[in-house]
Amino acid sequence: MPFGSEPPQLLRRKLFYQGRKFAYEVNRLRLPNKVEGEFECVRHPGGALVIPVTPEGKLVLVRQYRFTVKSRILEFPAGTVEEGEDPAATVEREIQEETGYKAAEIEKLGEFFLAPGYSDEIIYAFLGKGLEQLEQPPEQDDDEDIEVVLMTPEEVEQAILSGDLADAKSISAFVIARSMLMSQ
């Protein structure tokens, strides 16, 4: 039976974990068809991602270790949007912290949910143009080991197809920006 536009009714919400970056909760809902069920949800404040482009048309990516997948993965610079922070400010900070570049211009590409089946995390995607290398790159945090990787848009596309770039937020943002990047 289709639900139509009627939203489910929240019967009970139970918070199981509140961490620094996310919360985990279980919600008891009554659906419009009167069926009741429990739905798990990861609450996240949102993230911002940037595709930095050098004046030569190269894209700046980072390769870093991600404990959750026990691997060093290739991705575009991104970070959690802090409370009250504009997502554009998040990417300006992340470009500098993760790559040692500064963008003269930040252009919004769009926004999308990362995994709406279990999380409310939204990703704000941007293009960073007019990059300049910082004279003094910031020091990496003790828990970060980041390698900066420069690639052409065509090389990024090949990295996606080969599985070297397997980060969903980076792939989604690249798809949004692809036509702009390939025409430069």
Protein language model features and the residues they cover:
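A glycine-rich, hydrophobic loop/mini-helix early in the fold
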Residues: 47-75
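Short beta-strand micro-motifs in enzyme catalytic cores
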Residues: 23-27, 72, 122-124, 147
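Extended interaction-bearing regions that mediate binding to partners or small molecules
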Residues: 1-15
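Unchanged
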Residues: 37, 46-49, 54, 80-168
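Acidic, metal-coordinating catalytic segment for phosphate/diphosphate chemistry
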Residues: 12-49, 54-55
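Generic C-terminal helix-cap and adjacent flexible tail
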Residues: 179-184
